[in-house]
C-alpha cells in the first residue's frame, strides 16, 4: 500500500513511524515532511495547505490511503477533495472540521446539546465586548478568537487592561486575520486539564490513553503559551470513574450532536477537558491528533494504526478491539531560543547518543536537511519520547536522552511531568 501523510511536524513523524509497522505498507510519502521524517518516508515539497498540489500528487502516485494530520487543510476541506477523487482518507470532512475551525460553532453546539462547558458569550463588535467585560468585572476572564490561530488564539486576561489589550490584538490589529472577526468570552474554569484523543467513525468512539500537556514555555508553568512543551501519558487525574463520566456526558453526545447537525465526524476527535469541582467540562475540541500528545499516545498503542484508520474510514470501528500498553510515556520538547516569539534557524543539531537510548524515539518537528546534516527550521525542533513501566521511568529516560541533544540556543522545560508525579503521590 502507498500511504500519504499530510503535515510537517512531530505529530506527523509519530504517525508515520506507527504506520510503518504495518507490513502491508510499501511506501510512505509526506507533504511536506521534515528533516527527520525524510528517514522514514519520502518527503515531497508541497505545502500542507496547497490542496491542488497535494491532490494532483496523490492522484498521479495512485495513493491508496491518505492521513491528513494538521488542522488547516482539514478545515479547508482537503479530505473532501481527495475523497472525490477516490482516495480514502483518515480525517474529518470540511463540514465536520468546523468543530475546531470555529469556536463559536463548537460552543453553540455544546449549549444546544447540553454538553458541559464553560459559560460564554459571542461578540463581533469590539466595543460591545469591552462594555460586556467591564460590566461583568470578573477576572480572570478567557478571550478566544473564533477561528484557527496556531494554538495561540486564547488569552486569559487578569485585569480590565489585559482584556482591552487582548480584544485589540484579536479584533482590531487582526493578529490572527479573519479568525478574529468574532470572539468568545468565557468564564474561567479551574481544575486539572486532561487531553483525550479519540478515534471515531461517527458511530463508535474509542478514547485513546489520556495525556497531560504543558503549554507554557518555561518551568513552573511560567512564560508565554506555546503549542506544547511536553506531555505525559496516562494522565493520573483521569481516573476510570471520570473516564466513564466523560464517555457518557461528553464523548458520545458530541459525536451524536455532529450527526444530528448533518456533520458526521470521522477521524481523530480531540477533547481538551478540565476536571472542575462541578465535574469534567470541555475547554476545546480539535479535529485532529494533538501535538505533542500524539508523541506519547501512539507509542503506547498496541493495535495496528492503519487497521484502526481504515476501520474509521469504513465505519467499522465497533468491530475492532483497540488496545494500549499498560505503560507510561513522556515527551520533552526541545525548542529554539526565543520561541514562541522570534527565533534563529539553520543551526546544526548534535544528537549525541540520544537516538540509541533504549525505549527512546526522537520525533522531528522543526528540522530540515542541509548538506547532509540535520538543522533547526522551526520553533519546536524535536520531541524526545520515552516509554517505561511507570511515569518515573519514562521521564528519567526521556530526560537522559534530551540532555545529550545540543544545538545553538536550545532550551527545554526541566519540569515536564512534575504535576503528574505529585498527583500520583497523593
Q: Where do the language-model regions lie?
A:
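ATP-binding N-terminal substructure of ATP-dependent carboxylate-amine bond-forming enzymes
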Residues: 1-94
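Generic C-terminus detector
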Residues: 368-371, 375-426
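Generic long, charged, amphipathic alpha-helical segments
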Residues: 345-383
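Internal nucleotide-binding/catalytic subdomain
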Residues: 153-294
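A conserved helix-loop-beta module that forms one wall/lid of the active-site cleft
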Residues: 90-153
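Active-site "cap" helix and flanking loop/linker of ATP-utilizing ligase/carboxylase catalytic domains
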Residues: 247-269, 286-359
Amino acid at each position: 500500500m502507498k500511504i500519504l501523510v499530510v503535515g510537517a511536524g512531530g505529530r506527523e513523524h509519530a504517525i508515520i513511524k506507527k504506520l510503518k509497522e504495518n507490513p502491508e505498507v510499501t511506501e510512505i510519502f509526506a507533504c511536506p515532511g521534515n528533516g527527520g521524517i525524510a528517514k522514514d518516508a519520502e518527503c515531497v515539497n508541497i505545502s500542507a495547505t496547497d490542496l491542488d498540489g497535494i491532490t494532483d500528487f496523490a492522484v498521479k502516485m495512485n495513493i491508496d490511503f491518505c492521513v491528513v494530520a494538521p488542522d488547516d487543510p482539514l478545515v479547508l476541506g482537503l479530505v473532501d477533495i481527495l475523497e472525490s477523487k477516490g482516495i480514502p482518507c483518515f480525517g474529518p470532512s470540511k463540514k465536520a472540521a468546523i468543530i475546531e475551525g470555529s469556536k463559536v460553532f463548537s460552543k453553540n453546539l455544546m449549549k444546544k446539546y447540553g454538553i458541559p462547558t464553560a459559560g460564554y458569550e459571542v461578540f463581533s463588535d469590539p466595543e460591545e465586548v469591552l462594555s460586556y467585560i467591564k460590566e461583568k468585572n470578573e477576572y480572570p476572564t478567557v478571550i478566544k478568537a473564533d477561528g484557527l490561530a496556531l494554538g495561540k488564539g486564547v488569552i486569559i486576561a487578569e485585569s480590565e487592561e489585559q482584556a482591552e489589550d487582548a480584544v485589540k490584538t484579536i479584533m482590531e490589529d487582526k493578529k490572527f486575520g479573519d479568525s478574529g472577526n468574532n470572539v468568545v468570552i468565557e468564564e474561567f474554569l479551574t481544575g486539572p486539564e486532561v487531553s483525550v484523543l479519540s478515534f471515531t467513525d461517527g458511530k463508535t468512539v474509542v478514547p485513546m490513553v489520556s495525556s497531560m500537556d504543558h503549554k507554557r514555555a518555561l518551568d513552573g508553568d511560567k512564560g508565554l503559551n506555546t503549542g506544547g512543551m511536553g506531555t505525559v501519558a496516562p494522565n493520573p487525574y483521569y481516573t476510570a470513574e471520570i473516564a466513564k463520566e466523560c464517555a457518557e456526558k461528553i464523548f458520545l453526545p458530541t459525536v451524536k450532536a455532529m450527526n444530528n447537525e448533518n456533520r458526521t465526524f470521522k477521524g481523530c476527535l480531540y477533547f481538551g477537558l478540565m476536571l472542575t469541582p462541578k465535574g469534567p467540562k470541555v475547554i476545546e475540541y480539535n479535529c485532529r491528533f494533538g501535538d505533542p500528545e500524539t508523541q506519547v499516545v501512539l507509542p503506547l498503542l498496541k493495535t495496528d494504526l492503519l487497521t484502526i484508520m481504515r476501520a474509521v474510514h469504513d465505519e467499522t470501528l465497533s468491530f475492532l478491539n483497540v488496545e494500549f500498553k499498560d505503560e507510561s510515556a513522556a515527551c520533552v520538547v526541545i525548542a529554539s531560543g526565543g520561541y514562541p516569539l522570534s527565533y534563529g534557524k539553520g543551526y546544526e543539531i548534535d544528537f549525541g547518543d540520544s537516538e540509541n537510548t533504549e525505549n527512546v524515539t526522537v520525533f522531528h518537528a522543526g528540522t530540515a536537511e542541509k548538506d547532509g546534516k540535520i538543522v533547526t527550521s522551526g520553533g519546536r525542533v524535536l520531541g524526545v519520547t520515552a516509554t517505561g513501566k511507570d511515569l518515573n521511568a519514562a521521564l528519567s529516560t526521556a530526560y537522559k536522552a534530551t540532555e545529550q541533544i545540543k544545538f545553538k540556543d536550545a532550551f527545554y522545560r526541566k519540569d515536564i511531568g512534575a504535576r503528574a508525579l505529585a498527583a500520583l503521590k497523593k
